[in-house]
């Protein structure tokens, strides 16, 4: 029973000691120093992008976002322009007339 009392007191003390990082590793380095060095080595470097480099461009080197804004403005912020709608309606009429 006396042994269990010592273990009961020793286990939380050792655990607390390791959590705080005051324990040492086999090579003599402190636990927290080793972990912080590893974390620093693995930390990703921030990537700074210029505004133009962050946007995708088409084959001609033009900015796709700017082109889409321009196209939507011309269409009146509709998904399809008037010409495309008329062409689609004509195709639907032709197909429906062909089935009869």
Swiss-Prot record:
Coiled coil: none annotated. The record marks 85 as: Important for selectivity. GO terms for cellular component: extracellular region; host cell postsynaptic membrane. Residues 61-80 are annotated as: Gamma-carboxylation recognition sequence that plays a role in the conversion of Glu to carboxy-Glu (Gla). Changing residue 85 to I: No loss of inhibition of NR1a/NR2B receptor; no inhibition of NR1a/NR2A receptor (as for the wild-type). The keyword Calcium applies. Residues 52-100 are annotated as: Disordered. A divalent metal cation binds at residues 83, 87, 90, 94. Keywords: Amidation, Calcium, Cleavage on pair of basic residues, Gamma-carboxyglutamic acid, Ion channel impairing toxin, Ionotropic glutamate receptor inhibitor, Magnesium, Metal-binding, Neurotoxin, Pharmaceutical, Postsynaptic neurotoxin, Secreted, Signal, Toxin. Conantokins inhibit N-methyl-D-aspartate (NMDA) receptors. This toxin is selective for the NR2B/GRIN2B subunit. Induces sleep-like symptoms in young mice and hyperactivity in older mice. This is Conantokin-G. It comes from Conus geographus.
